[in-house]
Amino acid sequence: MSTAPPLATAWLVGGFGDACPFPTGSARCRVAAVSGPVHSCQRNRQQTASHQGRVQQGFRAMQVIGLCRFSYPAVGGFQVEHDSIEERIAYLYAEERMEERFHLMETVALPCLREQTDPDFTLVTLVGDSLPDRYRNRLEALVADMPQVQIVAAAPGRHRDVMKQVLNDARRNPDAPCLQFRHDDDDAVSVDFVERLRQTVRDCSGLIANHQTVAIDFCQGYVARLGDNGIHAALGHHPYFVAALGMYVAPGCRQTIMNFAHHRLARFMPTITLPDAPMFVRTLNGHNDSRQKGAKEPDLQRLDAAGLAEFDARFAIRR
């Protein structure tokens, strides 16, 4: 597994210069130590004054919106097929499955968001209006200490239509630009993910000012399996995974990150690819919807002490 450089050389992407602002040896300092620089895009494109002005004005206060689907019974959107919405609801709310989803939310999906170096973001957590009260109450208790989380309940509906509506409803000002990302309930992102999203927009302002949508892909990360015998993981280059994939949306644009299949974003808009540091963990578990068709198991290796320290510092995954 990768080893972080000496802590004395630590620095964090996001405008702090060469000095790490966090205590030496702290979790955030260790993340800073393994972060690499963001490569700036060229800024020599001609830009329209009105659009560029609106984009620049929105950089500092740009809203960042994440979408987490927590066992929402959508019509479509699953690779596991069901003959009726009732069958889908029964599958999603089965006790064994729900226990696994809560465990992954508690240990993987939420800790990394609690420790974001930039805590200014919104996480819309979409649930079904049929979610049993015991699960709704448990979810509310789980995120009670996270003011960023908004739990939204919706009736079953066409997957993409519901997701697009939820994201657009979450925009505080549709006439201002925003950044969007998806966050599955079994994945983690680096604790500087939101910080780096905003930094990338600033670095690539010339490109972004000329487009309605631009994808931002942090394409290096881990595939991992977490169990009683430790964490087994493989670091790799995975372009356009759901995890750590963001999208800029221009002022007034109603398109969302859910308008597009994540692996096809590059067909519809410019994309900024940042492969410099591990930015996500995608877990393998008993109910990975995207792995239901016999996907080949990657070559996972058990993390040693250095690997466990990186998962702790970078992703807030602790075992």
Map each language-model feature to its residues.
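Short beta-strand-to-loop acidic/aromatic patch adjacent to the donor-nucleotide binding site
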Residues: 176-188
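Short, acidic, metal-binding catalytic loop of nucleotide-sugar glycosyltransferases
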Residues: 110-120
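N-proximal low-complexity "stem/linker" segments adjacent to membrane-targeting elements
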Residues: 57-107
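Short beta-strand/loop segment that forms part of the nucleotide-sugar
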Residues: 121-130
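Conserved catalytic core of nucleotide-sugar-dependent glycosyltransferases
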Residues: 158-172, 190-264
